[in-house]
Amino acid sequence: MIQVSKVIPQGAGLAPVLVKRASTVELDWDVRQKSRFDATDSLGRTLGVFLPRGTLVRGGDVLVAEDGSMIKVIASPQPVLRITACSAHGSPFDLTRAAYHLGNRHVPIELKPDHLKIEPDHVLADMLRAMHLIVHEVEEAFEPEGGAYSAGGHGHGHDHGSHEHSAHDHGKHDHAPAKPATAATPAAHVHGPDCNHGHDHAHEAKPATIQIHKRRPDNL
């Protein structure tokens, strides 16, 4: 058994002539979603595949064996349900609605511009037909979406690992210290002719003028 522990997504970076000379191995989706499996390539060699946990193998990927040989993966045809919109009783939007309901059920879906593909399920097939969609069982390769956060998954045939994103380091730039807050000076309160609230603040009172009158005696 030849051990395989490396996968090159879509053979990125390899010379086309090397990929063309590589042996092939046909795998259905049930096997390709596993990180550990045995398979037999086109040369009759038994492969023991041990990939990082969570890795999804796609058709077009290239496996690298411990002896340096390469094996191109072919997604083998398998029974799937092909779902299309019914132009007579529905609209293309029905596919979007179907993808939403299938996603809520965590059903693996292959998304195409004009159709969807899922693994056979008679209950889901009846539900989709009730939504005015056309459902046919066919034999085709199945490449469902891997999920935005799946480890090692590359559902669109390119290697996201080659992109470099520089992280924004908040620890390396200095922020000027904030200026101390200055207490706002209250504005003078002005009462206009339309002011309707009462004057509850004190006004300075002027001192009262006291007048003293002397009383004349009655016998005068």
From Swiss-Prot:
The keyword NAD does not apply. GO terms for biological process: protein folding; protein-containing complex assembly; urea metabolic process. It comes from the Bacteria. Residues 178-188 have a biased composition (Low complexity). Residues 156-177, 191-206 have a biased composition (Basic and acidic residues). Involved in urease metallocenter assembly. Binds nickel. Probably functions as a nickel donor during metallocenter assembly. This is Urease accessory protein UreE.
